[in-house]
Design a protein with these regions (language model features):
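Early exported N-terminus immediately downstream of N-terminal targeting peptides
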Residues: 23-84, 88
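Extended, compositionally biased non-globular segments
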Residues: 86-89, 139, 161-164
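Acidic, glycine-rich flexible loop segments
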Residues: 104-126
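A short, solvent-exposed beta-edge/loop patch
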Residues: 119-149
Length: 164
């Protein structure tokens, strides 16, 4: 099983806008896309346990305190390793993140062609943060929703890892 690690240096305060999650729901219908949702109840249980958090084979959060997890409403993870699905997913994610209200925070490509795009959508105190990673033959999207403080995440050097 290949492990894709998305290390995030976070520079802004973020919470999440529930309405935006509906825009991503269609990604789960793409052939080859695996979709996992970690809801508020599970996040609260993880927050009570303390330390780093590993949600099975799907997601690991390192450096995130229980107080930070309590501010999350849910985490959605979309993974795809099928070539046609990766292309379709990439186009749909680009369409969403280039849409009205989304602010790009980080956009980058490395020498191997791996791409990362981190964007946020704010609505009042809540916002949605989308972390999209793409490389040859696979893509992963993490959508965080809640009232998180990105500044604190930077200070704690939070690392988000997606296992696929």
């Amino acid at each position: 099983m290949k492990r894709t690690i998305l290390s995030i240096a976070l520079a802004l305060c973020v919470g999440c806008a529930f309405a935006q999650s509906n825009a991503f729901a269609k990604l789960a219908d793409i052939k080859g896309v695996e979709h996992v949702v970690i809801n508020k109840t599970m996040l609260n249980l993880a927050a009570k346990s303390g330390g780093d958090f590993d949600f099975g084979d799907d997601l690991a959060l390192e450096g995130m305190s229980g107080d930070m997890l309590k501010k999350l409403e849910n985490i959605s993870i979309y993974n795809c390793e099928e070539e046609d699905g990766v292309e379709t997913m990439s186009k749909q994610v680009a369409s969403i993140l280039n849409g009205r209200g989304w602010e790009p925070l980080v956009v980058g490509t490395d020498e191997d062609g791996e791409k990362i795009k981190i964007s946020q959508f704010k609505k009042g105190k809540k916002s949605t943060i989308a972390i999209f990673h793409e490389e040859e033959g696979e893509s992963a999207l993490i959508v965080l929703e809640g009232k998180m403080d990105f500044k604190k995440m930077i200070e704690k050097q939070v690392e988000i890892s997606v296992n696929d």
